[in-house]
Design a protein with these regions (language model features):
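Tryptophan-paired
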Residues: 64-113, 227-327, 384
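A sequence/structural signal for flexible, mid-protein segments enriched
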Residues: 154, 159-267
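Short, low-complexity, Pro/Ser/Thr/Gly-rich segments in the mature regions of secreted, periplasmic
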Residues: 369-384
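Structural motif
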Residues: 49-62, 218-225
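Sec-dependent bacterial lipoprotein signal peptides
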Residues: 1-25
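Bacterial Sec-dependent N-terminal signal peptides
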Residues: 17-51
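Short, low-hydrophobicity acidic/polar segments
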Residues: 78-207
């Protein structure tokens, strides 16, 4: 019976300790979702890292953010934070130097991006997932087709200093929260006075998009004889290193199956139904590391199906020199209407499309239901 009473007493003590920890750390994020993470431990100092999303909100409004923190003398992360509070994160750190980065959302909310090596500040990276194409085959055995990435904004801070003085002041502030008798005893031991509560601030970090858009225009003549189009942009960056916000060395191909049609105008301002351009927009991590800016560094492959449902035309366009400055764009350059400026490529089909007979004797024209040609082709006609 005595042993049972001792066990019961021990359980009561243990439960009280757990409840006190939870009550003192009610905002601690156990990865169950977004919460403001705020905890205190003696011998640490609070550091508030401010975050400014103004350079990204016109692309997407984040609903939360994630931050990873490392000590300077270790490659292993010491903390991970997830928060609906987009304005700042509060870190409670031991004396030393620290690195951190933030990005919008959480890793699991992305469907086209996967994160790797997040335990290592210098090696952490984001990559597009591999997808299967119903019509495009890669040219090299180790190359792959990548999904178009969702919006991802990042910023980093290095060498956050937590000094001995900062820790001492924070420790004194902690003592000020103790009961009067215990507090006075501690102050007498330290021969110090109760301090004024302070907050050490860093930043703001200003996350910007590491995803770029590329607008591709394919100019054509004899547009009524075109039924559908497919495109592939080859040798783009597979991902980026998060801490340096620089592209990785690996390559992927992105396919384009959705196009808008933009007709030319005639001299009197009318619509020229025979001439125009197909416009496709590609989202990408940009150009891979080691890009030299030579034409053959990147290729745009276009495949056209004509209205006879038999004639297929193919064309390669070397564009490595044309898009050599793609990585300089991050969505912060805005036009007079406040919309982001992205680079454009204008490519011209070398000759007018052949005047073939429409299948079934119809009138021809664009058709998104193209059967075996592809399951994911869409051409949007403008309203005239």
């Amino acid at each position: 019976m005595r042993r049972c009473r001792n066990i019961a007493a021990s359980l009561v003590v243990l439960l009280s300790i757990i409840l006190s920890v939870v009550s003192c750390n009610k905002d601690l994020d156990f990865d169950f979702g977004f919460k403001d993470l705020c905890f205190y431990h003696p011998h640490t100092a609070p550091v508030q890292v401010n975050v400014d999303w103004s350079k990204f909100r016109h692309l997407e409004t984040p609903s939360g953010m994630t931050s990873y923190v490392w000590a300077d003398n270790s490659e292993q992360k010491i903390a991970k934070f997830r928060s609906h509070n987009l304005n700042y994160i509060t870190l409670n750190l031991l004396e030393g130097y620290y690195h951190a980065f933030v990005f919008n959302q959480t890793e699991t909310e992305y469907t086209t991006i996967e994160f790797y090596n997040l335990d290592n500040f210098n090696k952490a990276e984001a990559r597009v997932i591999e997808v299967k194409s119903s019509w495009y085959s890669t040219k090299l055995p180790d190359s792959k087709v990548g999904a178009e990435p969702e919006w991802l904004a990042i910023d980093c801070v290095q060498n956050i200093e937590v000094s001995e003085e900062m820790v001492a002041k924070a420790e004194a502030e902690y003592l000020a929260t103790l009961p009067e008798a215990q507090r006075q005893q501690k102050y007498n031991e330290k021969n110090t006075k109760a301090p004024t509560k302070t907050q050490n601030e860093v930043g703001p970090l200003v996350p910007t998009s590491i995803i770029k858009n590329l607008d591709i225009y394919i100019h054509l003549e004899n547009l009524p004889y075109l039924r559908s189009a497919l495109g592939a942009v080859e040798d783009m960056a597979e991902g980026c290193y998060i801490s340096s916000m620089s592209p990785t060395e690996n390559h992927v191909t992105h396919t384009i199956g959705s196009w808008d049609v933009i007709y030319d105008t005639t001299e009197n301002g009318g619509v020229d139904m025979m001439k125009g351009a197909l416009k496709g927009t590609l989202s990408t991590f940009g150009l891979p590391a080691g890009h030299s800016g030579k034409p053959d560094d990147n290729n745009i492959y276009i495949k056209l199906l004509l209205v006879d449902n038999q004639t297929i035309l193919e064309q390669d366009f070397p564009v490595g020199d044309i898009i050599a400055d793609l990585n300089e764009y991050n969505g912060t350059q805005l036009d007079e209407n406040g919309k982001p400026i992205w680079p454009e490529i204008h490519l011209y089909w070398p000759e007018p499309l052949p005047e073939v007979e429409p299948v079934g004797g119809g009138t021809g024209g664009f058709d998104v239901g193209v059967g075996d040609w592809s399951d994911d082709v869409e051409i949007i006609l403008p309203l005239l």
